[in-house]
Amino acid sequence: VSTSDHGRNNVMTISWHMMMDFTPRIAMATGPWDHSCRTMMKTKQWVINVPTGELLETVVRIGTVSGADVDKFAAFHLTTLPARDVQAPLIAECLAALECTVVDYVKRHGLVILEATRVWYNPWKKEKRVCHAIGDGTFAVDGETIDYRSLMTEKLPDGV
């Protein structure tokens, strides 16, 4: 997920999201402890970028540092593309992106409700398999499970 606040771009990882009914709405879990969430709540804009399998290690590493301290686009060599409906950038290395606006926030549950306003697809991307977080430091890339727990040990809650 990418955000932008007065030209300062950031990208964060999200491990849980879901489509909602038959509207272009998406529910996503995050909260005010997160730098990107605070930016998103201020600007009311996000881009959901859809990474593919070869980006998985980069995605995991993005989730281990804060955009308050690191320019993640520079640190992880990501290329920004301008969005059409929102200020947050698209990520050129991704397969697709959804430009979104915030329509609701359920604070008690850290649940952000987004509405997609535009979809972008990268037709030049050869890799089409997308990444899915399992929730314990392991990931699936369209059926293949890949274990990156060692990179996430500090971020995982006790007992996971």
Question: Which residues does each PLM region occupy?
Answer:
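Basic, polyanion-binding surface patches
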Residues: 1-160
